[in-house]
A protein has these predicted regions:
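Substrate-recognition/cap regions that form aromatic- and gly/pro-loop-enriched pockets
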Residues: 339-475
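A contiguous strand-loop segment
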Residues: 2-134, 154-303
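Short Pro/Gly-enriched beta-strand edge/turn motifs at strand-loop
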Residues: 60-66, 152, 349-357
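Glycine-rich, aromatic-lined ligand/substrate-binding cores of catalytic
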Residues: 232-379, 383
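Short, well-ordered beta-strand elements within core beta-sheets of diverse protein domains
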Residues: 138-144
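Histidine-centered catalytic/metal-binding microenvironments
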Residues: 453-544
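Surface-exposed intrinsically disordered loops and tails
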Residues: 115-122, 349, 481-488
Length: 544
């Protein structure tokens, strides 16, 4: 998908949580309705067949419960997009990226090849399934892992076994770590752990800009990769690091075939080795990374002719330390942003008509949802993970919190219809955006008030629910990681009691959204109606 991602390490976030967040944007001219659902173990397939690639995979018989935000329509498969399981492992998949022609030549994508000819003919060629992709990844990984590292390992094994037909970035997190995986060609992959005191920004471009091969093939503290990455790079001359290729210079020789060896550095830049840097990137991708980092490190020079980074810089860091700890409001703003405060804002008044539409903004018309998954270290496991969800175009909506460890989700978000309806959150938000867009300045005050109210109510609701559960646990245990109501311990009645509390909180949040989103639609519809091009102020004499 055409998405934007921001990841926040636990020491860079405002409350010590790991936060992974991504906009899920449809391709140009397409709008995919979204919903928010819980998947029970009995509903998880045991034999999986991809709709797009036709790959078939036998799955383990012990899946766990998980909650996701998939597409409503199944014409392109499940497309779970973002989710968290009962073990407080979270995933967001995928951030569509690109690799260069050298990589594609060395390890082609594993694409579906339809059958050719008639089955009984002598020249018949059977169908060749493709690999796995965005459609499949969360469904194949999330129900079977208990830590983020386990998730990376399972995903890596699937990529090496079945391959992939597209280039993707995949985020996997738990309460301690965030890992970002990038696919390299059809079967290879790299993964880097987001430093705890950093945030990372990814805008549809292969982003990791530093990789330690010594760690990946040694202690694996911060880096992981496919088992033959060094040989793959050497064989196909993918490293572009300058320097004399001798072992004393920190490089190691690896076989490149044909009886030759190629020296590789212990550290290299994957963005240069595997990625792209094209004029399209400078319009579509790099400006988004520039804007996110401009907001989180504002004291740097971003605008003068001497600025270190511009919207078209190819070397904007993948991760960096923010000037202040990052809040969920920061994340929601950034993933709804449209270059506010710059000449590139499509709703702005500075710059020119050309500059205001020069770059692709983060908050675009075709966003299906934004999901920020917060895994909190200071509460029991049962209520540890909160999914902040918004549907529709970001500048016209706001993210609301929902507990992930539930058996069911509110109907207002769960039962999104394929066709337009004001009976669910997705379509109501879509209508608000379309009505308000042409009258940004006249309607924006209603939208800003709505967003502030949603987030404030959400924070109050989460704090109140956390306190309610903590009060219930006081008589049970003082160990907040293992008290009997944590969803993984205690008897069935205890577990169901916690689920009931969390689901009641989610329903309360959904009820708030239904009431206030409907009011927002009324406000922007009335205001925009008065500003229609065919409006006429004079009424007939009998009109009141």
């Amino acid at each position: 998908m055409s998405c934007t991602t921001i990841l926040v390490g636990k020491n860079a976030s405002y409350d010590g949580s790991t936060i992974i967040a991504r906009d899920d944007d449809s391709g140009s001219g397409r709008y995919d309705p979204k919903r928010f659902v819980a998947v029970a173990p009995d509903d998880q397939p045991r034999h999986y067949r991809s709709v797009l690639s036709h790959v078939e995979i036998e799955l383990p018989d012990n899946p766990c419960r998980y909650t996701i935000a998939p597409n409503v329509l199944n014409n392109r498969g499940i497309l779970a997009e973002a989710g968290a399981n009962e073990h407080n492992v979270a995933m967001s998949a995928t951030e569509t990226i690109a690799v260069n022609e050298r990589v594609l030549g060395a390890d082609p994508m594993v694409e579906l090849r339809p059958a050719v000819g008639e089955p009984d003919s002598t020249d018949y060629q059977a169908e060749q399934p493709g690999g796995i992709g965005e459609e499949d990844i969360i469904t194949l990984v999330l129900p079977y892992v208990t830590t983020a590292r386990e998730g990376v390992a399972r995903l890596g094994e699937l990529l090496e076994t079945y391959g992939t037909y597209e280039s993707n970035g995949i985020i996997i997190s738990d309460v301690n770590e965030i890992w970002y995986v990038e696919t390299i060609g059809g079967h290879h992959w790299i993964a880097r752990r987001v430093p705890d005191d950093c945030y990372a920004t990814i805008p549809n471009q292969l982003g990791i800009d530093d990789f330690d091969l010594a760690d990946a093939f040694g202690e694996q503290r911060e880096y992981l990769c496919s088992a033959d990455l060094r040989e793959f790079m050497a064989m196909h001359h993918l490293d572009r690091t300058m320097g004399t290729p001798v072992s004393s210079n920190g490089r190691h020789a690896h076989s490149a075939g044909f009886g030759t060896t190629v020296a590789l550095p212990t550290r290299f830049n994957p963005r240069k080795a595997f990625g792209t840097a094209t004029p399209k990137d400078h319009i579509y991708n790099t400006p988004r990374a520039w804007y996110m980092q401009r907001r989180l490190n504002p004291s740097e020079d971003w605008d003068s002719p001497a600025a270190r980074y511009t919207p078209e810089s190819d070397d904007i860091p993948w991760c960096r330390v923010p000037e202040d700890k990052v809040s969920l409001e920061d994340v929601d703003f950034l993933l709804s942003s449209h270059f506010e405060g710059t000449p590139y804002d499509p709703y702005g008044t500075t710059g020119t008509a050309e500059s205001r539409h020069r770059y692709r903004p983060i908050g675009v018309n075709r966003t299906g949802h934004m999901v920020a998954i917060q895994v909190r270290p200071y509460v029991p496991a049962a209520n540890r993970t909160v999914m902040w969800v918004s549907f529709g175009s970001g500048p016209f909506t706001a993210a609301a919190p929902f507990y992930a460890n539930v058996n069911d989700t509110p109907a207002y978000l769960r039962d999104t219809t394929p066709e337009v309806s004001t009976g669910n959150l997705y379509w109501t938000n879509r209508l608000i955006a379309v009505v308000a867009d042409a009258h940004w300045y006249e309607t924006n005050r209603f939208i800003e008030g709505y967003a502030e109210g949603v987030r404030a109510f959400g924070h109050r609701l989460i704090e109140r629910t956390d306190e309610q559960l903590l009060a219930r646990s006081d008589a049970e245990s003082t160990d907040t990681n293992a008290w009997p109501l944590d969803g993984g311990h205690g008897d069935e009645k205890d577990v169901q009691g916690v689920a009931d509390v969390l689901e009641a909180a989610n329903d309360e949040m959904a009820d708030y959204l239904r009431e206030h989103t409907t009011k927002l639609l009324n406000d922007v519809l009335y205001t925009s109606s008065n500003l229609m091009h065919n409006s006429f102020a004079m009424s007939d004499r009998w009109a009141e």
